[in-house]
A protein has these predicted regions:
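TPR-repeat structural position
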Residues: 24-25, 44
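Canonical tetratricopeptide repeat
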Residues: 11, 44-45, 64-65
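Generic helix N-cap/helix-start motif at coil->alpha-helix transitions
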Residues: 6-11, 26-28
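Hydrophobic/aromatic side-chain positions at a characteristic register within alpha-helices
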Residues: 19-20, 39
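Intrinsically disordered, low-complexity, charge-biased linker/tail regions
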Residues: 1-6, 56-145
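Inward-facing hydrophobic residues that define packing positions of alpha-helical scaffold repeats
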Residues: 31-32, 38, 51
Length: 145
């Protein structure tokens, strides 16, 4: 795998662990941070699927203001939210939390052909399924306009 997606997949692992511990608020925080990381790697579909997962958990969440998270990046509200969460869950803190889970990122990453495929798997879907879900959501949004 070529791209450095360690922080993205770390946040996704922590989101998964939070879901298993029945901590939906914490899961949403990690999904939001993962989405921001995905955007920085031009993985807009991963970011937008994280957005859908956040809205599924909390339909009134701030991310609902935007149709895509690429649009959200233009907003100072998005910047403030991400900045606040990054202070709380810095790279170092996230890596410490991941160590507690006993996950070896290098070993896991070796089984995927791309960082995007790895990220999709941590969201519980294949990349193709994520793209299909997003296509349907976008079509549905267009038909209601």
């Amino acid at each position: 795998m070529q791209e450095d997606v360690d922080l993205l997949v770390t946040y996704l692992h922590l989101a998964w662990a939070s879901a298993r511990r029945n901590r939906p608020l914490v899961r949403c925080r990690f999904l939001l941070l993962a989405a921001d990381e995905a955007l920085s790697h031009q993985m807009n579909d991963i970011a937008d699927f994280c957005r859908l997962e956040i809205l599924r958990e909390n339909p009134a969440h701030l991310v609902g203001r935007w149709d895509t998270l690429a649009q959200a990046q233009e907003s100072s509200d998005w910047d403030a939210l991400v900045h606040q969460l990054r202070r709380r869950y810095s790279r170092e803190r996230a890596e410490q939390l991941l160590d507690v889970l006993g996950i070896d990122l290098a070993l896991e990453q070796a089984t995927y052909s791309s960082g995007e495929e790895y990220a999709a798997s941590l969201l519980g879907k294949s990349l193709e399924v994520i793209k299909e879900i997003l296509r349907r959501v976008r079509e549905s949004d267009e038909s209601t306009e």
